[in-house]
Amino acid sequence: MYVSGVTFACSIPVTRSLKQNYGANKMEQNPELEQTENVIEEHQLTDGVISVVLTADNHLGYNASSQPPRKRELRKQQLRHAFQQATDFAIDQGVDFFMQAGDLFDTTNPDEQDRSFVAERLAQLRQAGIRTLAIGGIHDTSIDTPTALDGAKVDFTFSTPSPQLSYARLGALHYFTQSSDLSKAPNPAQAQENKYLEPVVFDIRGTQVGVIGLSVVAGQEGDPLEYLPSRSDLDRVTISLLLLHAPIEGFTTDSSLDDIRAQVNQSSIANQSLFRYILAGYHHAYQHVSIGQCDLIVAGATQHIEYSDPDDEPGFVFLGLAADGIRWCEHITVESLQLRRLVVPVRQLMPQNTNTDHTDITDNILERLRPLCTEDAMVQLRLEGELTREHYHQIDLNKIRRYGEKHCFALSIDDSAVSFLSEQEIVASSNGYGSPVHREERFSPREELMALADEWIAAAPDEQERKALQATKEELLAALRHM
């Protein structure tokens, strides 16, 4: 596909002042931005240099069901605001391309408010003469049942169209789709052939720029770069780009999705000669590395989404690209929630004084938690180590949760690393802690619930209450199975 360049009907330079548009205070806080501005001013009128704003993993519509409605709505507003900071920056700088590398939405069926919001931002980009390119991600691309190809390969048929397709049909962006996004291939041979994606080529002030978009879906296996052609229309372009959404070997991945088995191998990147640049999403931390003759830039997320996210500041990337290398590559941070973590070894909570009650243990945790809790903080409290059930039940988790709800934006309590010691397996030691002599029992919410429920049922004063407690136990266990 070939798309002619857009002629700007105005005299403003392609790249305005970062200090003017990004703020003098921010420039003073980050000297690298001022250095970047000098580089941009040097190259902004040079033929052969294209400017790009790259963003990914915006996760619009993300819904933390554990939070109250007011905070859920505020969270959605924060996600939209972060994405708008990227589009506003692109418009202010008058860039050539705005590229979105997957997971624009957190769902395949975003609500009308998020859809309308994105439509407005895309309209503004188009009005500014900026070309917008996008690919789907793991969260905003749905799949149906896979069908076998050639006895080994798998092709995925999409049950519902990706939400970005509606914008593409209106001409607001170019959306790279797999063939199965639009229709089922009539036979396996054609389906296999259609896996090789067609590049789109742009003319930017006389410079030919070719782009291919590629993303993985849940259940896909292998290295997605194997589906790229060895030769294509990219052979005749000056600058070749791959817009990618996939796990990359060697990059930290802590996805909540268990069905991600595809991975781009670094050797595949090093051995390919088709792309000078790979602009990627999926990983939530910004990265810029050189692999072979290729520059790999990972945009990172525009907000912290999960507590497993890296500590890096969220943002987007501002790029100046040429055939012979990068002219500038700047990660621009956005306003975001702060991600903070507190690890508490539970052995430190086990009282040496037998008169110590649960209030002292809980207050001990709150005292450690207090400095981290602010209105703009996502805080994870992680309990680790070995303790008895008795000591565990002396921790008032509800009180800690209520404190978190009041003093920080969100609080998560992770006790998956707690191990229970049975009373029979504890031998009193001189320091009063006790030590395990045989085995440790891993904490399980389901088993803990069953044990507590059985205690209550056994202590029930009559048969009617025992039956009621038994029914409640079964309902809770059923709910746990679906969590």
What residues fall within each predicted segment?
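Extreme N-terminal basic, low-complexity initiation segments
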Residues: 2-7
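N-terminal active-site segment of His-dependent metallophosphoesterases
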Residues: 22-116, 121, 127, 473-477, ...
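Accessory, non-catalytic peripheral segments of nucleic-acid enzymes
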Residues: 28-39, 46, 325-483
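Structural beta-sheet core signal
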Residues: 54, 100, 134, 242, ...
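Glycine-rich phosphate-binding loop signature in dinucleotide/nucleotide-binding domains
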Residues: 92-94, 234-236, 372-374
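His/Asp/Glu-rich metal-coordinating catalytic cores
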Residues: 97, 108-123, 128-307, 311-313, ...
